[in-house]
């Protein structure tokens, strides 16, 4: 099965700040209309950390082997996800032996990829759900909560 994960945050600056984030899972099963699942949350963190947190939350929903393509405006996360095996080989440490930034999130993502035998790819830039996700994050004012939003949320598309 082919699954696309679309990531978005409400702020794209690099500073550590409170921000909203979200993901859309889009599963392609044969010729059927894609099935989507949505999750939103909020946390204090950097742009990269919140994108990784959204990806982590999306991957929790996976239980079997599949192909996953991650779409995000975060070019760093898109590039590094392709090198996750290299990061794991160094135990998520830099050349000085110190843990890389967001090591906990990278380790969790790597564990899930291995556990489910996920074949991963990534694209950086604006994506199909960017505008919709930004609108949803604005609608909810200051408090997005954590994880999946209620059934009353409008569906993407």
List PLM regions with ranges.
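RNase H-like nuclease fold core
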Residues: 1-53, 61, 134, 143-147, ...
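RNase H catalytic domain
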Residues: 9-15, 55, 59-135
